[in-house]
Swiss-Prot record:
Note: The prion state [GAR+] is provoked by the interaction of the two proteins STD1 and PMA1. It involves a complex between a small fraction of the cellular complement of PMA1, and STD1, a much lower-abundance protein, and it is transmissible by non-Mendelian, cytoplasmic inheritance. [GAR+] makes cells resistant to the glucose-associated repression of alternative carbon sources. In contrast to other prion forms, [GAR+] cannot be cured by GdnHCl or by inactivation of the molecular chaperone HSP104. Present with 238 molecules/cell in log phase SD medium.
Subcellular location(s) of the protein: Cell membrane; Nucleus
Keyword entries, A-Z: Activator, Amyloid, Cell membrane, Membrane, Nucleus, Prion, Transcription, Transcription regulation
Species: Saccharomyces cerevisiae (strain ATCC 204508 / S288c) (Baker's yeast)
Protein name listed in UniProt: Protein STD1
Function text: Involved in modulation of glucose-regulated gene expression. Together with MTH1, represses the hexose transporter (HXT) genes in conditions of low glucose. Stimulates the SNF1 kinase by an interaction with the catalytic domain that antagonizes autoinhibition and promotes an active conformation of the kinase.
Compositional bias per record (Low complexity), positions renumbered to this chain: 65-77
Length: 444
């Protein structure tokens, strides 16, 4: 890199001071030469002073003579070489400005000669003015912006951090649920009858009067076909604010999935997890749902695919059919438990029911009629009834004294026929209430 040489006047001043200092430190007290005396005789002039043109011409010969004596100027009178101290100073300044991080480490200053070290400690007004002006010239150059270079580096790193995507790891239930549902159902379903569309844009058959339907319908909507861009490559956690609210979680079920993956996703979902349905039933229901969906898909496409490429309505239909199956099963089992308990109480009550004691038929005279009764006959009837009641009372007292509590039935059991009849009744009532054409089956 080429550094512009300083003006000749300033150079004469600095070198003049330098030679004066050497002369003072010379133990032999050597007399200065004529050039040095002429340089010292020139008054100190600042670099920023406005010099006339003739002054520059007067100082020029002195400058040439001094340079020729010191051996620092070439034979060409129109070219002035830069003193080594200024080159070192400029080099150090450039290193400091281009390498701001070097401030944490000790800067290695090039001090090859004691001469350079002495020059660095010059504190005369002339040298200070020159250094000030010289450094000001650097402030206007491209190297006078060390903060800019540092800012560019830090800004670049911050841009890298900003461009690094930060994916969402937690979402609220409202954000996790879909906002629209028009793509989940075929146009025929949505446009057939506007009266069959709910306020949220879903068909009426998505609202069922079943046990915990709304809760599990929300869970079914958390089964998604693809990841959102803000989620990255991982499903976020669904956060709920309520203490007593159940936990929700997202599940991924792509549109192009194998039958086994669809079945496993449905069985391992949280749909009606509170009902504690056995895994065999859920597995059977999922297999039946997927098999029915595959049959309809092959009828529509006319081809058999190892992996079904489902449309969004077909995909949603599989989830809702499985949800309906497990919901009906949970409702029937809940109703069965209720009716079974009611039937057991009724059966227990009838088992412990004590029937009133009636007089034996032989004690009542044959052909006895009330309107034929005389006073004596009425008295005889009263006497017979009184004796019978007294006898029964004594027998009851003896029985209670002997501990008739052993004969009281505290627990009853139902036969398989009774259980099958109750289950059949529960299924029939649920199917009729929902408008399903399903046929009741045996106890599963």
């Amino acid at each position: 890199m080429f550094v512009s040489p300083p003006p000749a006047t300033a150079r004469n001043q600095v070198l003049g001071k330098r030679k004066s200092k050497r002369h003072d430190e010379n133990p032999k007290n050597v007399q200065p030469n004529a050039d040095t005396e002429m340089t010292n005789s020139v008054p100190s002039i600042g670099f920023n002073s406005n010099l006339p043109h003739n002054n520059q011409e007067i100082n020029t010969p002195n400058h040439y003579n001094l340079s020729s004596n010191s051996g620092n100027v070439r034979s060409n009178n129109n070219f002035v070489t830069t003193p080594p101290e200024y080159a070192d100073r400029a080099r150090i300044e450039i290193i400091k400005r281009l390498l701001p991080t070097a401030g944490t480490k000790p800067m290695e200053v090039n001090s090859n000669t004691a001469e350079n070290a002495n020059i660095q400690h010059i504190n005369t007004p002339d040298s200070q003015s020159f250094v000030s002006d010289h450094s000001s010239s650097y402030e206007s150059s491209i190297f006078s912006q060390p903060s800019t270079a540092l800012t560019d580096i830090t800004t670049g790193s911050s841009l890298i951090d900003t461009k690094t995507p930060k994916f969402v790891t937690e979402v609220t239930l409202e954000d996790a649920l879909p906002k629209t549902f028009y793509d989940m159902y075929s146009p025929e379903v949505l446009m057939s009858d506007p009266a069959n569309i709910l306020y949220n844009g879903r068909p009426k058959f998505t609202k069922r009067e079943l046990l915990d339907w709304d809760l599990n319908d929300i869970r079914s909507l958390l089964i998604v076909e693809q990841l959102r861009p803000e989620w990255g490559s991982q499903l976020p956690t669904v956060v709920t604010s309520g203490i007593n609210l159940p936990q929700f979680r997202l599940q991924l079920l792509p549109l192009s999935s194998s039958d086994e993956f669809i079945i496993a996703t449905l069985v391992n979902s949280d749909l009606y997890i509170e009902a504690n349905l056995d895994r065999n039933f859920k597995l059977t229901s999922a297999k039946y749902t997927v098999a029915s969906a595959r049959k309809r898909h092959e009828e529509m496409t006319g081809s058999k695919e190892p992996i079904m490429r489902l449309s969004k309505p077909e995909w949603r239909n599989i989830i809702e059919n499985y949800l309906l199956n497990v919901a009906v099963e949970a409702q029937c089992r809940y109703d069965f438990k209720q009716k079974r308990s009611e039937y057991k109480r009724w059966k227990l009550l009838n088992s412990n029911l004590k029937r009133p004691d009636m007089p034996p038929p032989s004690l009542i005279p044959h052909g006895f009629k009330i309107h034929d009764c005389t006073n004596s006959g009425s008295l005889l009837k009263k006497a017979l009834m009184k004796n019978l009641q007294l006898k029964n009372y004594k027998n009851d007292a003896k029985t209670l004294g002997a501990g008739t509590q052993k004969n009281v039935v505290n627990k009853v059991s139902l036969t398989s026929e009774e259980r099958a009849a109750i289950w059949f009744q529960c299924q029939t009532q649920v199917y009729q209430r929902l408008g399903l054409d399903w046929k009741p089956d045996g106890m599963s």
